[in-house]
């Protein structure tokens, strides 16, 4: 993959560069950024609530949230579409509750890029949840006690103490999410969204152009490396250490 850019480009790559390549890169970037944001939101918040709060069913949710791994993103895609489509599952439920009516115009439609983003987010946030929850579990209780002694509210403790301490775990989870997201083909194909993965698939299997497929894969690696560089630059020289004493 890394040496493919030194090879002579094919006619198909030239055609792709003049037509759809920018579109592929743009779609992949939008989906990646949106999925990273949602998985960060779902994963960190769910890990925080099950780690620091005691509510009915908390022990159940500690393990149930891991089950997002069990369902591939394209299965979420099919289920999401079937539930919200015209005369779909949600329509049947509303009709059963309130009788016949034109409810389709009130039911939101999750298709295209929005559907792909939601499906991948529901499937992949488990990476962030598992690693962040493990980090929260091993955080020293002294940090929390110090924040309380300093008069921090729960919100201030979360943003100033808990979240920064869990940064390495969160970044590791988001890195896995990014690689899974960019390599996904089934979900984006289901929603008819063209990404770099679509270009790789078409280049290799439809046009038998392995070199172009490798060159497109190189773009994916560049995006991942750029994310690592940005994270490392924003972290500066900060180092993170965790006590083995958890809650």
Q: What do the PLM-derived regions correspond to, one by one?
A:
Residues 110, 155, 193:
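Residue-level marker of regulatory loop/turn positions in helix-turn-helix DNA-binding domains and
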Residues 11-14, 62, 92-99, 141-149, ...:
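Short amphipathic alpha-helical coupling elements at transmembrane boundaries
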Residues 12, 18-19, 185-222:
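Interhelical loop and adjacent transmembrane-helix boundary motif
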Residues 1-7, 19-136, 165-185, 213-233:
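Membrane-water interface segments at the C-terminal ends of transmembrane alpha-helices
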Residues 150-152, 164:
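Glycine/proline-centered hinge or cleavage motifs at structural transition points of membrane proteins
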Residues 127-130, 160, 198:
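Short alpha-helical elements of helix-turn-helix
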Residues 18, 54-57, 137-142, 152-155, ...:
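Juxtamembrane helix-boundary/capping and inter-helix hinge elements in multi-pass membrane proteins
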Residues 230-247:
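Alpha-helical transmembrane segments of integral membrane proteins
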């Amino acid at each position: 993959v890394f040496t493919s850019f030194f090879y002579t480009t094919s006619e198909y790559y030239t055609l792709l560069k003049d037509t759809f390549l920018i579109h592929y890169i743009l779609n992949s970037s939008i989906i990646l950024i949106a999925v990273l944001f949602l998985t960060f939101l779902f994963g960190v918040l769910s890990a925080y609530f099950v780690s620091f709060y005691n509510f009915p069913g908390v022990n159940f949710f500690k393990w149930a949230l891991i089950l997002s791994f069990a369902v591939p993103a394209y299965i979420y895609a099919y289920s999401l579409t079937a539930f919200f489509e015209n005369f779909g599952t949600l329509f049947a439920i509303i009709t059963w509750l309130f009788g016949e009516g034109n409810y389709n115009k009130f039911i939101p439609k999750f298709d295209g890029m929005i559907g792909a983003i939601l499906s991948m987010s529901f499937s992949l946030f488990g990476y962030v949840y598992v690693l962040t929850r493990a980090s929260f579990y091993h955080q020293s209780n002294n940090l929390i006690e110090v924040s309380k002694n300093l008069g921090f509210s729960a919100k201030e403790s979360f943003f100033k103490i808990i979240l920064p301490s869990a940064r390495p775990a969160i970044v590791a989870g988001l890195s896995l999410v990014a690689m899974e997201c960019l390599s996904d083909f089934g979900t984006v194909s289901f929603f008819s969204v063209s990404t770099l993965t679509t270009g790789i698939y078409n280049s290799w299997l439809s046009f038998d152009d392995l070199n172009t497929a490798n060159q497109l894969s190189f773009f994916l690696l560049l995006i991942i490396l750029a994310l690592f560089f940005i994270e490392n630059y924003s972290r500066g020289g900060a180092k993170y250490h965790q006590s083995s004493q958890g809650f």
